[in-house]
Amino acid sequence: MKKIRLALQKSGRLHDESLQILNNCGIEIQKGQNQLKVSSSNFPLEVFFLRNSDIPGYLLDNVVDIAVIGENLLHEKGEGIVVNEHLGFSKCRVSLAVPNQSNIENVSELQSKSIATSYPNTLKKFLKKHQIKAKIHVINGSVEIAPNIGLANAVCDIVSSGSTLFNNNLKEIKTILKSEAVLCSSPSIDEQRAELLNQLLFRIRGVLSAKKFKYLLMNAPADKVDRITGLLPGMKSPTVMPLADKSWVSIHTVIETDEFWNVIDLLKENGAQGILICPIDKMFV
């Protein structure tokens, strides 16, 4: 039987969070130190640990079938690669920034200026869209130093917390691209591996859905059931179960975590007691 080939970042936060989501999906990966290729013991999956910037090329050449990479890299190097699922972690942005003391306040003022970046393709598309002509200096690392050494008037680089910009006396003037980790696939994936991808996506979506919801249980007066269930923005109809005391019932439902805080006071005002919120491990809808 064929195995689906997954490319992951060799190290770093994206690597760690990618392995964590596989673990949450029940897929066992035992990686030894310095191993660049491992197989799952309970799912037809091979994992390749590669340099992040090389992964789009491996996908396009069909060396690997799927990968977890950031949208920033996909936008820069991954034209033609298929995005299958947004994963909700490793969030960042690609932004334009200038020195704090610069008179440049908006992107139109970058006309005829010089910009240092590790994302030349992303920057070129943005400048073309806004009809800005600027000189682009391509740098593979430490982009933020470029204005301080007189190489560029501005930088275009990845921003996470903003601390690197702050430490280099830079300020953001425009976000070009918002990014998070995505599961993506080769445009040439074969039919058998595409089916394995669907099985993996089913598991991943169950894990991602569970993060957004909580299981809500409460006791309520039987004569307040209609009013209380009407307050619950949960999935379909809540489960209502009788208790030993016939004047009380137990209400069970699934609710978005953020929505719960909007209704908890109303639930209590209408007689709900013993309210419990439980995490959900997986959820398939």
Feature-to-residue mapping (PLM):
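Small-molecule-sensing regulatory modules
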Residues: 2-45, 71-82, 87-93, 101-285
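Pocket-flanking alpha-helical
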Residues: 53-58, 63-79
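Active-site-flanking structural segment that lines cofactor/substrate pockets
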Residues: 39-57
